[in-house]
Design a protein with these regions (language model features):
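Hydrophobic residues within the alpha-helical transmembrane core of Major Facilitator Superfamily
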Residues: 19, 47, 125-126
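Short aromatic-rich membrane-water interface segments that cap or initiate transmembrane helices
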Residues: 1, 66-80
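Structural signature of hydrophobic alpha-helical transmembrane segments
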Residues: 2-13, 78-82
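Loop-to-helix transition at the N-terminal end of transmembrane alpha-helices
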Residues: 28-48
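N-terminal signal-anchor/start-transfer transmembrane helix
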Residues: 9-31
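Transmembrane alpha-helix/helix-exit interface in multi-pass inner-membrane proteins
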Residues: 43-59
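Hydrophobic, aromatic-rich membrane-embedded alpha-helical segments
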Residues: 110-133
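Alpha-helical transmembrane segments of polytopic integral membrane proteins
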Residues: 16, 89-96
Length: 147
């Protein structure tokens, strides 16, 4: 399959995982299952790309120029993209699971998921801020033991 087709397929399939995370209510485990299966598939694709093409790339991770040279190889650039897709989806899955565990509204989770999908760490930072506030306010509302 041409690399451009693999790129399009991976980029389209990951949307199903994000849609499941955003649309399926917390009480249904389907969203987690869909997202994890897609992340596993993307991780397998990543491993296959790295296994097949790693030796063909020039460059490395020692400098920005080295990384640029490494990503000049189309298959390794695709591998980097698939890496982003898989890891961001796993972070989004964790955000959803954690939001459900702490009782964070799905409506508050949605901007976090959108930002994690588009800008990775920015969405995670927003989620962590919301998580902190939610946990802090929950503690204030809990009765003190022995009173």
């Amino acid at each position: 399959m041409p690399l451009e087709s693999v790129f399009s397929l991976a980029s389209s399939v990951v949307l199903l995982g994000w849609l499941a995370l955003a649309a399926v209510p917390y009480r249904f485990p389907l969203a987690r299952l869909v997202a994890v299966v897609i992340a596993l598939a993307l991780s397998t694709l990543y491993a296959a790309l790295m296994g097949a093409f790693w030796g063909e790339g020039k460059g490395g991770f020692g400098s920005l120029a080295d990384v640029s040279a490494l990503f000049a190889h189309p298959a390794l650039l695709l591998g980097g993209w698939v890496h982003y897709l898989a890891f961001d989806l796993l972070v989004g899955t964790w955000e959803r699971e954690e939001a459900a565990a702490i009782g964070l509204s799905r409506w508050l989770l949605l901007p976090c998921l959108g930002l994690t999908f588009m800008f990775g760490p920015v969405g995670w930072l927003l989620f962590m801020a919301m998580r902190f506030v939610r946990k802090a306010t929950s503690r204030q509302l809990e009765p003190v033991a022995g009173t």
